[in-house]
Design a protein with these regions (language model features):
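S-adenosyl-L-methionine
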Residues: 270-302
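SAM cofactor-binding core of SAM-dependent methyltransferases
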Residues: 217-229, 234-276, 290
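A short acidic, amphipathic alpha-helical/loop segment
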Residues: 248-249, 298-300, 321-328
Length: 424
């Protein structure tokens, strides 16, 4: 996870002096374009600050203790005194206040994020950040999870195979957890989203050396909705986990069969022994013990109708795997491929590069962003170089905005992955 953008450290962002760089895109630099770019830039700064606040707090396992539910559920007195506003204030009020204070007191050190202070006084900036945080929070309905077909059908009993264990974990009441982000047209840079339940919720997990490796939680469920929706015919999935995708795909009448490619024999053993027997349509399931990269090399186009890749655990460990595997699947025309949390890779690592490149070209100033790991920085630098090969012409604010849509960004990412293959 990135360093908090609003905290002073040696890794913070500055805007350098003017510099000359090879043009990336042909941008018409009229006032309308410049104004639209400035609006996008401030949306980015606000979003990155809010993303870091939410995700940093969740990483520390944020939860509200001794909650006064009578007060929380009491009649709302104004738009600023709602249930969600009270939750937001309890959970994030102090850290947002700290962030705003830091932005005003350490402007030089916190550039470019302190640009947010140019047009707003501290009170208004605090309100704006709190409103944005609140929009990123979701009170989850536990009944919707419990009514999920997988939860209704699959019951987990503790079991172990070498260092891999099948178990359950839980969320405490009012414990915040990261959820799968919803695209927001009004601010495409927002991806830090958190949910909570009012009740204790239990969910299945796979542990590796006593640490959670895989789980079926609300974020996982929502992250696969579109991929499950398009599953039909002969389906193949690379990565088994707890079998959520395989289960949901096998439940569809449109799915003739579901082939699972998994290289971990212990995960396969636990699944076959504990989970697969509970599948209503277990006869549709076929498991192949193999490495996904080795398997895809020999796979013929059209043997399967739908393919889904999910053999990484999160955005950090998955970035290289996604880019490498996506490039391997680009040759398929008949088999339709999708990739777990592809939009998250876009939001975390690629969309920020595009806005940075755009602003550097328009302002002719170098923008230095917070340090990330060397591996991620290498990918981002290669993506920045790749953008220089694009001949897009931007002549209106509308065209500028379209660059940052999910469709446009995913197209860029996939083209980048194919033209700049990653090494193992």
């Amino acid at each position: 996870m990135k360093n908090c953008a609003w905290k002073e450290s040696g890794n913070l962002c500055i805007i350098g002096k003017e510099y000359k760089e090879e043009k990336t895109m042909d941008i018409l630099k009229n006032e309308n374009i410049k104004n639209a770019a400035a609006v996008l830039w401030h949306k980015f700064l606000l979003a990155e600050t809010v993303n870091d606040i939410i995700l940093s707090e969740i990483k520390d396992r944020l939860y509200l203790q001794n909650v006064d539910e009578d007060w929380l559920m009491s009649p709302e007195t104004s738009p600023r005194d709602t249930f969600m506003a009270r939750i937001t204030d309890l959970a994030f009020g102090d850290v947002v206040e700290e962030a705003v204070t830091s932005l005003y007191e350490n402007k030089e050190a916190l550039l470019p994020y302190s640009d947010l202070t140019e047009t707003k006084d501290p009170g208004r900036l605090y309100d704006l950040m709190m409103e944005t945080v609140m929009e990123q929070l979701i009170c989850q309905d536990g009944s919707t999870v419990k009514k999920n077909p997988y939860y209704e059908q699959i019951h987990i009993s503790p079991d172990k195979e070498n260092c891999i264990a099948l178990a359950t974990a839980d969320y405490l009441p009012y414990e915040f957890f990261q959820t799968f982000p919803r695209y927001k047209k009004e601010n495409p840079f927002l991806y830090g989203e958190a949910g909570f339940f009012k009740e204790r919720m239990t969910f299945p997990v796979i542990l590796e050396n006593n640490r959670v490796w895989m789980s079926v939680v609300p974020s996982e469920i929502r992250s696969m909705e579109k991929d499950i929706e398009v599953a039909k015919g002969k389906v193949i999935t690379y990565g088994l986990g707890l079998g959520y995708y395989a289960f949901m795909a096998s439940e569809k009448e449109e799915a003739e069969s579901v082939t699972i490619v998994e290289m971990n024999c212990d995960v396969i053993s636990l699944f076959k022994r504990n989970i697969l027997p509970q599948f209503p349509n277990k006869e549709k399931i076929r498991i192949i013990e193999a490495d996904a990269f080795a398997f895809i090399e020999k796979q013929e186009d059209g043997i399967y109708d739908t393919a889904f890749s999910d053999f990484w655990s999160d955005v950090d460990d998955g970035l290289d795997l996604y880019l490498r595997f996506m490039a391997k699947t680009a040759r398929f025309a008949k088999t339709k491929h999708s990739y777990w949390i592809e939009t998250c890779f876009m939001e975390y690592f690629f969309r920020p590069v595009l806005i940075r490149v755009l602003m550097e070209q328009i302002t002719e100033k170098k923008i230095i962003m917070p340090e990330v790991s060397g591996r991620i920085r290498k990918v981002q630098n290669r993506f920045k170089t790749y953008l220089k090969t694009k001949n897009d012409r931007i002549t209106s604010p509308e065209e500028l905005t379209l660059l940052f849509t999910n469709e446009s960004m995913i197209s860029l990412m996939r083209d980048f992955a194919v033209k700049n293959p990653m090494r193992p």
